[in-house]
């Protein structure tokens, strides 16, 4: 049966067991593997506009729904940066990828940088778009007054679980708009797809657990100095991170190539897909 999410998707959708859960991923094309990993409370559809810019006769696209996101299952675990990184590492091994370009956005970017710091042999280059490694109680609080309320109260007892479940399409459109320079760049139907997937078993608990583990994303920065892989560090000029935080990452990651995208917020994959695709095809 065609689901609201899958009706927008190419037919190359797969599922596999990874680290105690079932992970949905898109796999299409042939050539250099390019792995896409999204951010919190979103899913692989975030990258469809970027994927459309790529020549899949030259690259093999793998886009992942993280555990507890999209149509992947939500195991009853603590959703730390380490847990997500282990899950993605397990999928890379399962797919037996080699010399992959890793494209991550927000927490997806942080996952890519942690994998690079671990010296994961399956990755050749990381394109880290707006890594999520800053902000007391979570960087998303900086995005708008509404999101400050949402991402603060989700941490509270009693109210937190209620907020985690309150993902109507209308509310999610407002939340996502906090990550965009131009809110008209939000694709029609995306908020509805995310809302539907957020109602799947365990997903609200996973979302709140991820938010409660905000310190694990900040502490990941201590690992960046161990990175030896090439890294393209990409920031929207209107990202939630502060210029000093971006400069610190550029200094801490050996040899990082820093790129700033104009008129771009946190969700660069939605606002500037052509520019992201160009960095993938010519990362240096």
Locations of regions flagged by a protein language model:
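Conserved HGGG/HGGXW glycine-rich cap/lid loop of the alpha/beta-hydrolase fold
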Residues: 21-71
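Short glycine-enriched nucleophile-adjacent loop
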Residues: 109-120, 126
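Conserved alpha/beta-hydrolase catalytic His-Asp/Glu region
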Residues: 137-141, 163-225
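Conserved loop-alpha-helix segment in the C-terminal half of the alpha/beta-hydrolase fold
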Residues: 54, 226-264
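Alpha/beta-hydrolase fold catalytic core
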Residues: 1-35, 56-59, 97-98, 181, ...
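Flexible "cap/lid" loop of the alpha/beta hydrolase fold
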Residues: 117, 125-159
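Catalytic histidine-centered segment of alpha/beta-hydrolase-like enzymes
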Residues: 264-277
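Active-site loop/oxyanion-hole signature of alpha/beta-hydrolase fold enzymes
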Residues: 19, 26, 62-107, 117, ...
